[in-house]
Design a protein with these regions (language model features):
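Catalytic cores of alpha/beta
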Residues: 95-100, 220-232
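N-terminal capping/small domains of soluble enzymes
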Residues: 2-93
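N-terminal small/glycine-rich loop or linker at the start of catalytic domains
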Residues: 7-30, 109-122, 141-156, 202-204, ...
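Conserved small/polar residues in nucleotide/adenosyl-binding loops
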Residues: 303-305
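Hydrophobic faces of well-ordered beta-strands that scaffold small-molecule active sites
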Residues: 17-20, 52-56, 83-89, 108-110, ...
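Alpha-helix-loop-beta-strand connector modules within alpha/beta enzyme cores
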Residues: 65-87, 131-144, 198-213
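Active-site beta->alpha loop and helix N-cap motifs at the rims of alpha/beta catalytic domains
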Residues: 82-147, 154-165
Length: 305
């Protein structure tokens, strides 16, 4: 899809896309994919859509989830894309790492706390205690030949309310062999101006780190915030097919892709000619209908009067 619009060529860059449909998208109220459905979605995302990475589950949820992850890992290995399969894991005395390993995976997206409130009220730990547990989990994951990415849960609130805590954590975390830092707007509170400010601060303070941005759509700003994050130095974006996700959803894959390419000339590896196909597949499996006027993939999106 192309538009005759002047592009901001000074901003051209290559953006890594991680699809979270099978993990965060499944948090949509009433949505639960069967193992074979998760495999079919994963196959299309990896092979036909050519997304860079897929987050396929949360560790230790159920035996059905374990079966699904194992199937996906086996398939991904046959096409040389096992490194593209990621699982959300926890700081839980190595149980998540072992669970992922038993499934055949070796990339963990480790969930840490990005705000002082989450650290002290949810975990009931001091920042120093939390850091020690994170380091121990990472050491164990590395001993299993894992790649470690790290979520800073509630990052947006942390930047707004407890920046000293967040920077103290990051100052220590950047010393560890973490491949990517995943920065979620967990409660969907950001606007694009805040997203620009916060992402620029992260990039300037930690210029050698890779940052992903993970948007939520509570104010209908997930796509706008994703674009703001990229223009401010984020190297990766998290999306879901049809914008599925808890509460009001996540940034939709199709919208993010076409805006990045058409409006800003950003480079991705996404094959746009299959976006409608993956949208229909997920629509069928999820039971969540795509509105006819949905941008890019809606039935009315290409009709002009």
């Amino acid at each position: 899809m192309n538009v005759n619009a002047k592009r901001d060529n000074s901003r051209i860059k290559e953006i890594e896309i991680m699809d979270c449909t099978l993990r965060d998208g499944e948090q949509t109220n009433g949505v639960s994919f069967l193992p074979h459905e998760k495999l079919m979605i994963a196959r299309m995302l990896l092979h036909d859509i050519n997304v860079d990475r897929i987050e396929v589950a949360s560790a230790r949820v159920s035996e059905g989830e374990k079966d699904a992850v194992a199937r996906i890992c086996r398939y991904a290995k046959t096409i040389g894309k096992l490194d593209s399969v990621e699982v959300l894991g926890f700081v839980d005395n190595n149980k998540s790492v072992d669970w992922i390993a038993e499934c055949g995976g070796h990339v963990i997206n480790l969930l840490a706390k990005g705000s002082y409130k989450h650290c002290t009220q949810q975990l009931k730990m001091s920042p120093e205690e939390h850091l020690a547990h994170i380091k121990q989990t990472i050491d164990y994951a590395l001993s299993k030949d894992f790649t470690v990415n790290l979520y800073l849960e509630d990052w947006s609130s942390g930047m707004r309310d407890s920046r000293d805590y967040l920077f103290m954590m990051m100052d220590e975390l950047v010393k560890l062999p973490i491949k990517r830092f995943l920065l979620p707007d967990t409660l969907g509170i950001l606007n694009p101006l805040q997203c620009v400010e916060y992402m620029r601060q992260m990039v300037r303070r930690y210029p050698d780190s890779h940052f992903d941005f993970h948007a939520h759509n509570d104010y209908d700003l997930a796509v706008s915030n994703s674009l703001a994050a990229v223009l401010s130095g984020a190297k990766g974006l998290h999306v879901t097919v049809n914008g599925l996700g808890e509460r009001c959803g996540n940034a939709p894959l199709a919208s993010v892709q076409v805006i990045l390419k058409d409006m800003f000339g950003a480079k991705t590896n996404i094959k746009e000619d299959r976006l409608n196909d993956i949208s229909r597949l997920v629509e069928g499996y999820s039971g969540i209908a795509v509105a006819p006027n949905t941008p890019v993939v809606g039935d009315l999106s290409l009709i002009h009067i």
